[in-house]
Amino acid sequence: MPTMQRVAITGSTGLIGNALVGHLKSEGYTVQRLVRRPSRSAEEITWDPQAGTVDLEALAGVDAIIHLAGAGVGDKRWTKKYKSEILNSRLLGTTTIANAVNAVKPSVFISASAIGWYGETGNRAVIESDRAGEDFLAAVCREWEGAADLVKDVRTVKIRTGLVLDPTGGALGRMLPLFRFGLGGKLGSGKQWWSWITLHDQIRAIVFALESKIEGPMNLTSPNPVTNQEFTAGLARALHRPALFPAPAIALKIALGGFSTEILGSKKVLPQALMDAGFVFDYPHIAPALAALVD
């Protein structure tokens, strides 16, 4: 049985949250989902990030709180209104949860962040100690992590997540239909670095953070980032299809607006904190990872 018996999670219906809930339950944890409506069972706890409230009585006695909730950065076009939603959903939600953590004092608080923290890195590899970038998502991440830093006297881990790979969602889920029909190719120049991690290793790394002594920022990426050209060529090989249809940068900018900077931008991020703590990836290299994911 796990040493931490009871875990509360926000964002439990997302790609990562849903997989994490299933894994934790299979490992013997009691999992409670934070929901934005009246709770329907003991497995649910009501919270309202807009109002800044959490049912603290229901949350009392929890061993760990994992905060994953936030508006998806790739879900909608980056209008001024949606950019505000991206920021505010993280700032209000994390501030609310941080205050709840300070009230109930679990053993550990794990708060989502992203490798967007680093901004554009070009060909330069970055680790957790590197400073934040200057673009929109870097600014979001600074405020997001700043809200998590409101927590005092509780071990806190800020998980800077990279490109999470799973065939059921995220970037890979969107790319697969085109690549299965042989219509895929590199995006833009293809020279931009993609710092990726399988959903499988993402979940393992979060559980590692839960059960170990690690704290502070933690990059959740493979130790072997690849260029977009390497990624798309590898995906085509895994599917036994050609990759003959590149998407020009201008087309992506027209189709995706501001979010295109995340597709075309370069982030070469290494998981130094995880490696220093002894975490071992099941899928450290892209070729076997993609082969397993599309099998």
How does the language model describe each region?
Residues 176-184, 192-226:
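Alpha-helical substrate-binding/gating segment
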Residues 6-27:
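N-terminal Rossmann NAD(P)H-binding glycine-rich loop of SDR-like oxidoreductase domains
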Residues 39, 43-93:
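NAD(P)H-binding glycine-rich loop region in Rossmannoid oxidoreductase-like domains
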Residues 95-135:
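Conserved Rossmann-fold NAD(P)-dependent oxidoreductase catalytic core, especially the SDR/UDP-sugar
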Residues 1, 261-295:
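C-terminal amphipathic/interface module of NAD(P)-dependent oxidoreductases
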Residues 132-135, 162-169, 189-197:
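Glycine-rich "substrate-gating" loop/helix at the edge of Rossmann-like oxidoreductase active sites
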Residues 211-258, 291:
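Mid/C-terminal beta-alpha module of Rossmann-like enzyme folds, strongest
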